[in-house]
Amino acid sequence: MYSLGMKVRDYECDIQRVVNNANYQHYMEHARHEFLESLGVSFSALHEQGLDLMVSKITIEYKRPLRGSDMFEVRINMERKGAKLIIRQDIYNLDGDVLATKGEVEVICLDNGRLTRGELFDKLFKDYFDKNA
C-alpha cells in the first residue's frame, strides 16, 4: 500500500465549508501520479514511446466530508483485472483515521492509439505485484 498525506486548502471548500466534491478527484489524481512516480513510472517518457495510460472509469463514494485545514491521507492499492489496472484509493481524515472517500479507478493502456491487453502493466508494476501478492 502507498499513502500520501495532504492538507485541505480553504479555497477547495464550497459554501457549506466542506471540500467540494470535484476536489476529491484532484486529490486522487495527484496521489496516483505520485504513487506511479515512486514506482519509477514516467507518463511523459511512456507517451514519447507511444504508450499512454488512460483513465477509463472512476467511481467515488463520499462517506464523510473533509473541511478546511483537515489533514488527510490518500491510501492506494492496485491490481490487474483483465486488460485493466484497478487502482483503489481511499481518503482518510487523519483526525481519528476516519474514512472520508472511497475511490476506484480503472486504467487502460494504449499503444500508439490502440487498446492493449494490459501487458505493459505487468512489466511496469512487476515489483509491486510481486511484493503485494
Language model features: what each stretch is:
Residues 1-54, 110-133:
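Hot-dog-fold acyl-thioester-processing enzymes
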Residues 3, 67-68, 79-133:
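HotDog/MaoC-like acyl-thioester-processing domains
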Residues 35-73, 77-85, 102, 106:
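Hydrophobic beta-strand-centered segment that forms part of the acyl-chain substrate-binding groove
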